[in-house]
Amino acid sequence: KIFINISGYSIDEIQKRFGNLNKNKVILMYGYQNFPTDLGKTRFKIFNKWRKKNFLLGYADHSEAEDTSLTYLGSSIAIQNGATYIEKHITLDRKKKLPDYVSSFEEFEFKNFIKYFKNFFNMLDNDVISNDEKIYKNEMGKDY
């Protein structure tokens, strides 16, 4: 697979430059390129246009790592708009201020991020009534 960052390009520029590539092997990565990312300026709605052109999509997250809610929010919105890949930087020690440190998760934060998205995907993909729900329904006398 080839990952191409398309941040800052219009849909016409992307189509002109990458329209002839094998869409099953190219992932268009989008993320508002500023450190840290201002989620209010991120154009998540544009994912729908790219998806209609059958491109695989990814989200390059550069939100402030110390505010994990921003990363979770941005990545969740991207996934719900068609992103199947998430780029998130990791670092062993953010205090060393290496490149991209502002948006880099430390190990424990990254583990929590993975755990969150395992649950997130389970919630999105699950449409079966669980045994727990059936038991609750019966115990509460819900028989409409």
Residue ranges of each PLM-predicted region?
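Catalytic cores and adjacent flexible loops of soluble metabolic enzymes
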Residues: 1-144
